Regions:
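Thiolate-centered catalytic microenvironments shared by cysteine-dependent enzyme domains
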Residues: 16-110, 127, 168-169
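Positively charged, proline/Ser/Thr-rich regional signature most characteristic
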Residues: 1-36, 105-168
Length: 169
């Protein structure tokens, strides 16, 4: 279990948002404490359509580590489940700075870079906002809800289907 608030994000702030990227040293320490090392291959899953596990995989990959999502997440796992907590010994995970090329900021969004809003369409349109203090979206952003990347059973669409979906972008 990799906690969002302790490992995958820094504390919320008005300037950086609800789940800002974690400090790279704190991220490395959190993973090392969980027994995830520099050379480990991580397969992540969640029960949220891949949103949380996807964040872990993205963070690991932009740091050059080997990581993948379990397609379909927990709901497609066909084996038995357990309630036992697996503990791994502390590992070595060297802190690495976040690569600038993998990140955008407000100035990037304001200067015409393509911005995709992956939230639900009703949140994008400002019709419903159950989480954030303001409804709506970044001016100029396009709505491509992450749920559109998945089939009815929660698995990712084929690469061809995803290419077609994003061809208009």
């Amino acid at each position: 279990f990799v906690p969002m608030d302790d490992v995958l994000a820094d504390p919320p702030s008005k300037a950086r948002g609800r789940h800002p990227l974690p400090d790279h040293d704190a991220f490395a320490e959190g993973l090392a404490h969980l027994g995830i090392g520099d050379t480990d291959t991580v397969v992540a899953y969640d029960d949220a359509g891949g949103a949380m596990a996807g964040r872990l995989v993205w963070l690991l990959r932009i740091l050059g580590r080997d990581a993948a999502l379990l397609d379909g997440g927990l709901q497609t796992w066909e084996g038995e489940l357990t309630t036992e907590v697996t503990r791994r010994p502390r590992a070595e995970f060297a802190p690495t700075s976040w690569p600038d090329a993998a990140l955008a900021d407000i100035e990037d969004a304001a200067t015409g870079e393509l911005v995709i809003d992956a939230r639900g369409a009703e949140r994008f349109r400002g019709e419903s906002e159950p989480i954030d203090p303001k409804a709506g979206h970044v001016p100029g952003a396009r709505s491509y809800p992450m749920t559109g990347n998945l089939t009815e059973d929660g698995r990712f669409r084929t690469p061809e289907e995803l290419r077609e979906r994003f061809a208009a972008v």
